[in-house]
Amino acid sequence: EVINVTKVDIISGFLGAGKTTFIKELIEKVFAGEKLVLIENEFGEIGIDGGFLQDAGIEITEMNSGCICCTLVGDFSVALKKVLDEYHPDHVIIEPSGVGKLSDVAAAIENVKEDADIEIEGRITVVDGKKAKMYLDNFGEFFENQVEHASTIVISRTQNMTDEKIEACVHLLREKNDKATIISTPWDQLSGDAIRHALEHGAEIEGLFEHH
């Protein structure tokens, strides 16, 4: 009997960074046709309306156990196990609240691994390119945690930035994380395959995404 491992992607980032838009891109381009569950906690940007998801054949499980980072491993693990038992999804996307620490969310998922066949595929942080420096200065602890623990960093709003600004932003992020794949190409110009490749293969293919 083949055990299907559910892949989990965590999409972190501050409120307004563009997480919801990126998740829509993932759902439409990358995970189309897969059994997918999106878990967002109620403080997230609930910009994805039920209708959109139902059309895509995705069931929404609302987590009302409060902010993942507050309840940490307690309720979150229970909710995640319930989702896995009920839906047996191929993929779970978790959108923690804006100030959630990525390391805490990843630790909570690792905790569930003992009882369930899951693996973390990507720890993705979406960063508003125009605000990265301001976030670092003002919300250092949370923002650094999201950047340092990411396997892929997606810079949003790059279509409105000069190349110098984008380079400065990449440099700033690289100081905190020299291993993650950094995608600075506007997402709508990337194919689903390119995005999937970035999530799965990490830093090997950085050359594809460096913005010229």
Predicted regions and their residues:
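A broadly conserved amphipathic alpha-helix scaffold signal in soluble, globular proteins
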Residues: 103, 107-110, 151, 171-174
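Short histidine/acidic/glycine/proline-rich micro-motifs that form metal-
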Residues: 132, 159-160
